[in-house]
Amino acid sequence: MHCQLGGQARALIFLMFESCRNSWHVSPWSSVPFLPSPCLFFSFSALPFLHPLSQLIACRGSSATWLFPVSSGTLVLRYALAASPPRGTMRPSTNPRTAEEGRPWLIHATQTGPQTASVLSLFPAVNAGFFSACRQHRGGRPPCLLNHRRLLLGLVSVLTVFLSCLPFTNATVSPAALQDVCYAFGNISRKLSSFLVPSRVTCPRGATPLSGVEAQDSLEHPEIPDFRFLVYDVKNGEGFHLQKEVIYRVALVISLLNARSAQQGRMTDVHTAEKAREDRGHPQASHMLCASSSFSHACSARSTFPFFPMWVLVLPPWCRLAHWHFSEETITAMAENSWLKHVRWGTFFDFQDLGERLPVMEYEDFLTYQLMRPDPWGERRQRKEKQTTPVELDVVLSVRFSSTPSSRSLPFCACLSSRASEIADEQAQRDDVCCNVNDLPGCPQIHAALTPQERQRAPAQRGGDPREEIDEQTGEFNEGHNPSGDGEREKRKPGRRSDTSRSRKEIQEEAKVSDTWSGVSLWLAGFCETVRALEMWCASLYIADAPRIADLLWRSVAERPPGAIQTVWLKFGENLLVPWPDVLLDAHLLDMLHVHPKLRQIGDLFINKFLSNRDKTETGKGERASTEGGTEGDENLAKHGYIAAHLRRTDFLYLKRSVPLQRAAAYLVSRMKEHGVFKAFICTDGSEDEKRELRDAVRRVGDAASSSPYTVVFFDLPTVRRLMIKTLEASSHVSDDGSFHDLKAVETPGYSGPNHISLLLHPGITALIEVWIAARAAYFIGTKDSRFSQAIRWERHLMGHPLDSSLEVFCVDSSPDQTGGQAQGKCFATKSHDPPEGRSRSELRRKYWPSLDPSSTL
C-alpha cells in the first residue's frame, strides 16, 4: 500500500467505477481544506510532515468502508470504489467514450511545482482522462461502493505493484494548456497548497472560470481559512547558530499542531459518516479507531471546532546578528547588491529539503502572500486609523517561565478571548490565570521590544511599565532589563519614585485611560523592521515545551471566532525548552536543515586543496569520490588528513573563558600527533595577529616534539576567492530570491552579477562553510559553552562521527570543575541534547554522503 516516490511529486488519483451492485456509500470529505467535495473521496497525496497516523485505520460498517494506510515520509494511497457519480459531480474532459460504454475508468492527474502534469494512459482496460473540476453535490443519491471483497483486495494488490513501478516524472505542459489555468494567488499560493494536497486548479472569486468548463461546474473557493502562519524571532543580540537552533523548537510546535489538525479532521469525517448511517437507520459501528503519531483512541467524533487549517512556519529574516562583522568591502558590495544585505534562509540551507519536512516559507514570501491573498472572511476589522507599519499580525505571543503553585498545578493554559476590561477584572479576582491578554504592564518582555513611538504612548494609555522610566530632562528611556527578562535591572536615578512600589490596582486604574485596545508595535528581532500586533498574549508556564505551546495555541485559537486568528507571532522563541533529540527524530525533524549544496562544494574544494594529505596524482583521481562520497569509515577520515578546532576569542577573552594561545598550540600538536595527521583547521574570530601568533606557536611546539612539520590552516577569504576564480569551471550564481543558478563563463568581461565570489563576502556564509569543513575532520576540539562549537558537534553527530571524536574542548585552566570533566589531560563538553549515538545515521547523512553503504558503521 505504500509507494516511496520523489519528494517533489504531488499525485492525485481518483478511482471510480460505474457499476453499482448495492447500497455501499462514501460520505463526502467536506471538512478538510483544499479537498473539493463530494466527488473527491480519497487521494494519493504527499504528507511527509504531518505524520498524523501511525497505523492502518479501518472504519468499516454496513454503509461505508474506509482504509487509511499511512506512513510518515511516504506517499499514501487512499482509494474508493464507487458507482457513477450524480450528474454534474465529475466532468472528464477527455475520453467520453469511457462513460458512454459504461466501462470502468481511472483518472490520473499529477502536479509538480507550478505546472500541471499531463495525463497518462495507463492500460487498455482503464482509460485516463484529464480531470477538470468538481462542484459540491447539492442533492441526489450519493455514489456507492461495490460489495465484492475479492475485487477490492485484488485492486489493492494490483495498484500496489503498479504504483511502485510507475515512473512519476515532471511532465511538460503546452502554453495553451497553461493559459486555461486561473492562478489564484500566484506561485506562493500554489506552493502553500502543495504542502497539504496537490495544488487546486481553480479560479479566484470573481475571476473567469477555467477554459472549457461551465461556471456551475467549476470548483468554488472554500469559505474557510486555508492556512495559519506562525512567525517567530529571538531576542536581539543572539547569534546565527542560536537562531538556527530555535527553528527545531518551533518546527516541533508546527508539527504537533498539524498532526492535531489532521487528527481532528479525520474524527469529523468519521462523525459525518456515522451521522449519515444513523439517518439511514443503520446501527452505529461497534468500534472505530483514530490515531496520531503518539497515541490511538476510540473516536468520539464530536469536535466543536469545524475548521482544521494547515499551520505554516515563517522563518525570521537575518538582520543584525552578533558576531557578524561586515568589512568595508562587504558594506560597499551591499550598496550594489541588495540580496547581500538580507540573505535568505534558502542561501544558507537547502530550502527544498526543508520544505519536504514541514510547511515553511521565507519571511519575504510571507509578506508577499499577505499582501496578495484575499481575506476569506471579508473585512474582519474596521480600522479607524491609518496603518503605520508595513506588517500587521493578529497576535503576538510571549512565553516565560513561572514557578508559582498555580502554574505548576494547571493542566493546560489558554489565552481567553474577552475585552481588556473584563480580563483585568478577572485577573484581579483570580490567581490562577496563566495568560494575560492585552495587559502590557504584566508583560515586561513585550514592553522591552516596543518601538520608541509605542513607548511614548504606552505610559499614558496603559499606566506605564514598572521596569522602565523616562528621563525628565532628556526624554530618553532608562531600560532596566533585557528583552529576555533574565538580566539584572539597572539602578534607577535617585529622586525618582520606583514604579515597582505602585500597586497593581493603581496600574490597572491608569490603564483604563484607554477605552479600547488598539494594538502594539514591536521591533522584529535584530531591529529588522516594525511589526504591529493587534492582540497580545503573555503566557506564564512552568514547562514551556513544544507540546504545551502547541496546546496553548490550539485552545486559544479555537476559543475565538473562525478566522479571527490567522497570523501568530511567537516573540522570543528561545524561551521554548530544547526538545530531546529522540523526540525530533521521531518527528522527522532532527536532520531537516541541510547545508546548501553550493556551500558544501566550496568547503570540499577547500579541503581537497589545503587539508588533504594525498599527493597530486591521487588527488586528481579521487577528488570526485571524496566530494561525493565523503567519510566512508576510518580510512577516509585519515585520507582527509586533518583535525579541526574552534578557538573563540573576542567576548570570551573578557569573560576569561578562552584558552591561552600557547596552551592551545600544545593541545593541537598533541592531538595531531595522536591521530597521525599534520594539519589542523582552525575556526576562530580572533584577529590576524592572534592567528599569526598561533601559527608560530604550533610550529615551535611541533619542531620540539617531532621532526614532522605541524601546521594550522585558517579559512582565509582572499585565498579562497583566488582559488575559486582559478579552479571553478562553472560558477553558481545567486539570484535575488536566494536560489542558485549555474552559469558558464563567470569571468566574462563586464559581467557584474552576483556569484560565489561576492557571496563569500557575507560573514554568515563563510562561517557556515567553516562549520562544514570542521564537521568533516577526523577529530574536533571545541570551546566550552560556545554555540559555534555545538553546531559543529551537531553536524558531526548527524554525519555519523562517534561522540568521543567531537566532545573534547580546550581546558581553560587545570580545574576539571569548570570544564565539565577532565580525564587524561582532556576536557569534555557536557553531553546535553546531542543526537543519540546509534541513531545518527539519518536522511541527512544519506543526503550528504550518497555513496555511503548503509550497512557500514564508523
Curated annotation (Swiss-Prot):
Residues the record marks as site: Essential for catalytic activity: E795
Stretches with biased composition (Basic and acidic residues): 486-510, 831-846
GO CC terms, sorted: endoplasmic reticulum; endoplasmic reticulum membrane
Example of a GO MF term: peptide-O-fucosyltransferase activity
Residues that hold GDP-beta-L-fucose according to the record: G237, E238, G239, F240, H241, H646, L647, R648, R787, F788
Transmembrane segments: 151-171
Reactions listed under catalytic activity: L-seryl-[protein] + GDP-beta-L-fucose = 3-O-(alpha-L-fucosyl)-L-seryl-[protein] + GDP + H(+); L-threonyl-[protein] + GDP-beta-L-fucose = 3-O-(alpha-L-fucosyl)-L-threonyl-[protein] + GDP + H(+)
Protein keywords: Carbohydrate metabolism, Endoplasmic reticulum, Fucose metabolism, Glycosyltransferase, Membrane, Signal-anchor, Transferase, Transmembrane, Transmembrane helix
Membrane topology according to the record: Single-pass type II membrane protein
Domain of life, per lineage: Eukaryota
Pfam family, one: O-FucT
Side of membrane Lumenal, spans: 172-858
Family listed: Belongs to the glycosyltransferase 68 family.
PANTHER family cross-referenced by the UniProt entry: GDP-FUCOSE PROTEIN O-FUCOSYLTRANSFERASE 2 (PTHR13398:SF0)
Protein name listed in UniProt: GDP-fucose protein O-fucosyltransferase 2
Lineage, opening ranks: Eukaryota, Sar, Alveolata, Apicomplexa, Conoidasida
